């Protein structure tokens, strides 16, 4: 479950332990300054509290990190990686900033040079040359390992808060709702079939996204 952590408390953790089948990916974006600048004042403190609770209760969790042109160094530094390990997280997904919505800020998108840096940095952190016990995965730059874009029902799709089924968390179009359609019906709907038939969107799996790199 991907979460902003704000609803994780002691009773919730006890219920998760009872269930025994849930892991969490906590959204965090570097230092208190870089994190709260994007996610709102007080969010960093909420994540720290959630990490402490999850670690105390022995609940498996990792991180979900959005890297931007401004925070890329803060969220990939050795210091930050070791800090996450100390808090109890040992794996996580990186997502580069995608300009979606009415308040999108395209200027926050990583530069080509920064994307190249991320490719090299993630591979180093996963290598035997690195002694930090944290395993990072990059939603964009690891496309070569999964055959390109995994969205549109190929490996996953997104359900928003209204129940609308969307090809990807970053692509807000839908022609089916989970409340009145089965998973199979959603996957066979015109939008999802068009997505399916378009795969792969680029032979270069380092450029897998149909919205960002192959519009």
Residue spans for each PLM region:
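Flexible mid-to-C-terminal extensions adjoining Fe-S/redox cofactors in radical SAM and related proteins
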Residues: 165, 170-215
